[in-house]
Amino acid sequence: MDIEVDIIEFKVPLENNKTIFIWDIQPTFTEAYIYESLWSVYSAFGDLYLLKVCPNATVAEPGFYALVKFYSSAQASKAQRATDKQCLFQSSPLKVRLSTKQNLSFYSSKPLCLSKCHNLANHYLGFGGWTTRIVTLKDLSNCVDAGCQEETGDQGVLLKYGCIMELSFPHHGMSCQGVGVAEEVLDSDQDPEEKLRKRGALMKRAKDKAMEVAFEKVLLLILGNGKVAIEIKIDPDEIVPEENSERVIKVNDISWTHIESADSNAEEDFLWDLTEDLPY
């Protein structure tokens, strides 16, 4: 007999089969009450990436509709089948459908912000199921010999930090590493205390980006019996130096483009564009 396995990745769930719509929500309750009620119902099927409750358009009858995004297509499908035409928290049945809008190819993958990575890992692995450590954290502001010094103008001072983080899963005997970089150009006459604060913020940004990259490599395998296995995606072209290497970040043949573009603050900007067609 085949073992059922659900694969969950640490990326923004954009697929239609991970998104469900709920409508025919009565205006009897407040938006906050509806949110809490829906969260209580649907989080029982699996960890949720997003839940939004919105009032109906003015041309429609008074009431609300909701969007729920799961990390797992299997969990979304199970939730849809179990709750469609059910009253749940109100006196009349709800309509629950999977999204049907065609996805655009360039929205195929987007990494999770670090806070959501933590939530997802804690949900399936527990607070002791994973650990992190800094392999190296380097100041790259003056790495002229590595070819990474940039023109900042007469009034600018470049601050740049690079970090390698290790993500470990002690109960599974597995680990992976991620690389992150953060930079900012400061005014040369800026207050020294402000420069010190910016240095600390840049080091944290580099560390957080490295952690996001490390989580991107992880696959959670949810077995039919509820147990969780771990797999690590290996990129044969990736260059991650050894821990004891000197000048570990100072290389100029690693592309940081995909890291810099993964701005976590913008990850939800396009969510509604992908799921605006409500099936009836």
Curated annotation (Swiss-Prot):
Gene Ontology CC, one term: cytoplasm
Record's keyword terms, sorted: Cytoplasm, DNA-binding, Nucleus, RNA-binding
Domain RRM: 18-101
PROSITE patterns assigned to the protein according to its UniProt record, in alphabetical order: RRM
Domain of life per record: Eukaryota
Cytoplasm among keywords: yes
Entry-linked Gene3D superfamilies: 3.30.70.330
InterPro entries: Nucleotide-bd_a/b_plait_sf, RBD_domain_sf, RDM1, RDM1_RRM, RRM_dom
GO molecular function, one term: DNA binding
Transmembrane spans: none
Main location: nucleus
Keyword Cytoplasm: yes
Compartments in which it is found: Nucleus; Cytoplasm; Nucleus, Nucleolus
Subunit structure: Homodimer.
The protein's role, per its UniProt record: May confer resistance to the antitumor agent cisplatin. Binds to DNA and RNA.
Protein name: RAD52 motif-containing protein 1
Species assigned in the record: Danio rerio (Zebrafish)
Organism lineage string: Eukaryota, Metazoa, Chordata, Craniata, Vertebrata
